[in-house]
Amino acid sequence: MQQSPFSTVSGAQAADQGHGKVTFTGSIIDAPCSITPQSIDQTVDLGQISKEALLSGGKSTPRNFSIGLENCSFGSPATKNKVQVTFTGMESAAKNGLLGITGTAKGASVAITQADGQIIKLGVPTKEQVLQDGNNTLSFAAYLQGDGDSTNVVTEGEFQAVTDFTLAYN
């Protein structure tokens, strides 16, 4: 008996031609806006920075990042349509309110700024930003800053700094 080209092959006889798994994760929050998935866990590359640029409190070039809010709904009249962001993390050894770095590099801190360039101190809420129904973008920047005067030693090496953010709607 000849097999038709349209006959099916049982699962036991079929070759594995690829397989995988898709896992869906997330959380439900009590807020007027959802946070975009890209905003929840970000990496901002500050680049390879010359230690000379950091002497006497010098700064690297700011790198932009944002927190995306989507599907915002505030009702009518609008309530809780203003948001403040608080960044937290390990403070710099210089105790300057900036984010401390870990790794082999020393003598510098990460500064986080609002879109207008104003430094955001760790643990201090940003000024309120008014939101619209729909999608919104909260814009920030970060740069590496030397920790002190010309006597402060900046040591080259790799570094990392981690901050968490919290949103508070008003």
Mark where each language-model region is:
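Mature extracellular/passenger domains of Gram-negative fimbrial/pilin and adhesin proteins
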Residues: 2-170
